[in-house]
A protein has these predicted regions:
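Low-complexity, disordered linker/stalk regions enriched in Pro/Thr/Ser/Gly
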Residues: 242-359
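Short helix/strand-bridging catalytic loops that position acidic/His residues to coordinate divalent metals
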Residues: 98-101, 132-138, 326
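Hydrophobic/aromatic-rich core segments of domains that either
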Residues: 73, 113-194
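Sec-dependent N-terminal signal peptides
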Residues: 3-13
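Catalytic cores of secreted or luminal carbohydrate-active enzymes
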Residues: 195-281
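Secondary-structure boundary elements
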Residues: 19-107, 113
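Cleaved targeting-peptide boundary
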Residues: 16-20, 158
Length: 359
């Protein structure tokens, strides 16, 4: 977190200026590890939103994490998963949503691709997570699992969500990201992590490791597709690499799937990232730079916001209004309080950044 509390000329005005407690704003981390994102202007997204009435699924809910839970639950309820029968080859989101109520041998790949499209359609920044425990022996939990991570503006963090099981993991009531689940697995086997399910986030009993996606050990190893525009480009393959967080554990161990070394090693398809912040980049969060020039504060805004519509500013108790990437505010006394935020094409607002400007 960083503080933006800006005063000029205090030496001659300390008696007239009432200094408030420091302002803590969300930390900005740019996107340097991932490539393309879904394009909300693509016709397929309009079809998805309208045909399946996604607005109805989140009607009246303004908290974005609760919206995510509602959309996850909606998808989980819509797709009828049957354990028997032929595997369904087409993993396109629209076909899963269309045929899902009829039932079929759907699994994590279908659900993660569909949830990625549903969340994206409603403006949430999301990505597919591919994971596994990575063990060579025993092999009872040695395959892979597909789920999703979504950036939550209200929590200002990434959260791992699983549509197949309508669940996610929490520690002390805080939803965890994929890397945070992995941290707990490597630390002590995730003893203090709970899997919670449904809209009411009810804790679930611990299950055996062979229950895919229902155990934290599923996330001992994690990768993310580097290209995030699968739905926009369908049926084209978005290509790209598998982003792998290369910490000390990843450098000194090998990821196994089904008893064999992960295919991406020999194929040269791992994009190894040693900087954790590059993986846990901060969508929608602002990077604000300020400079005092004479009687004005010059403000410059940047961000890594997919599908950015505009930046907005709110002065004091006024209304939100559009803000340019660069603008100036004349210095006043008492201090000028300013809120800034990003807004994407779906109308979702990013975390607010607060400035207190004064002479």
């Amino acid at each position: 977190m960083k503080t933006i509390l800006l005063f000029a000329g205090l030496a001659g005005a300390l008696g007239a200026v009432q200094v408030e407690p420091p302002v803590k704003n969300p930390a900005f981390r740019p996107n340097t590890a991932f490539g393309s994102h879904e394009d909300l202007r693509a016709p397929r997204f309009e079809e998805l939103r309208v045909k399946y009435r996604l607005e109805e699924a989140v009607k009246g809910e303004t908290d974005d994490f609760k919206r995510v839970l509602l959309l996850r639950h909606w998808l989980h309820a819509r797709v009828v998963v049957e354990k028997k029968g032929p595997e369904l080859p087409d993993k396109d989101a629209l076909s899963t949503l269309e045929e899902g109520p009829k039932g079929g041998r759907y699994h994590c790949a279908h659900l993660s691709v569909a949830l990625n499209a549903v969340l994206s359609a409603m403006g949430h920044v999301t990505r597919i997570v591919l994971s596994g425990p990575g063990e060579k022996e025993p092999a009872r939990l040695s395959g892979s699992h597909g789920s999703n991570e979504v950036w939550c503006n209200s929590l200002c963090k990434w959260v791992l969500v699983d549509a197949e099981h309508d669940s996610h993991f929490e520690k002390d009531g805080v939803p965890l990201s994929a890397l945070e689940v992995r941290d707990e697995v490597l630390r002590d086997g995730a003893k203090s992590v709970a899997r919670v399910r449904g809209l009411d986030r009810r804790p679930e009993a611990r299950v055996e490791d062979e229950s895919w996606g229902q155990t934290a050990r599923t996330y001992g190893w994690i990768s993310w597709p580097s290209e995030g525009n699968r739905f926009t480009r369908y049926p084209e393959d978005p290509g790209g690499f598998q982003v792998l967080y290369e910490d000390e554990y990843a450098r000194t161990h090998t990821w196994y799937r089904d008893g064999r070394k992960h295919w991406a090693y020999d194929a040269g398809r791992f994009k190894r990232i040693s900087e954790r912040g590059a993986i846990e980049w901060t969508p929608n969060v602002l990077d604000v730079k300020t400079r005092l020039q004479g009687e004005e504060w010059e403000v410059q805004i940047a961000s890594s916001t997919p599908n950015l519509k505009e930046y907005q500013m709110k002065k004091g108790d006024g209304a939100w209004e559009r803000a340019e990437e660069k603008f100036a505010i004349r210095v006043k006394a008492p201090p000028e309080k300013v809120l800034l935020r990003s807004v994407n094409l779906a109308g979702l607002c990013g975390p607010e950044q607060r400035l207190v400007l004064a002479r």
